[in-house]
């Protein structure tokens, strides 16, 4: 555990997202690089039932979110009705939605839980103890996979055919063999906001355990923005160094 705590000691700004449409990439923050002890720790949480690691890994995610919110404190002041921008203290605090990357139903059944959801819930618990009263965070699981027969709207024919043939878990497995552009193409149209009304006009932060090429996060940004959410950025426990992204 001391070695893991040391690996999570510094939050870095990561340049990982490369949207295909040329839009500005959202800011990415991670508490560690995905190397050394981090792969073992995160895989232990995901595949070995090591939920006892949640407090420490959740602390890493919480620090990433905290640094992102601090970097955007001026932007948060402009949220209508926020107590940050009000002269008095009667206005409600700004509520930031922490939105976990989705897990496939198959992986949840296999593990018995969704690791990203647990990490986000733990991070939210820790953040609400640390943040000023003018800012609150809430874990909200609103992103899901589009049924495979409806995927790929607006994507290339090959992407639509591939998306149709792959389940959510198969899509994730297939992505491991693709480069950054291939992963982004495969993810386009694969996600949806299950409760758009919950996100409209709200500030959100996308959260995951690991950011690699950013294909999943970029697609989450796209669908959240289409639902009217203001996405501040992407936060993760760890990020794969660029030289390791293939």
Task: Locate predicted features.
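Glycine-rich phosphate/pyrophosphate-handling loop used in enzymes and phosphotransfer proteins
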Residues: 1-246
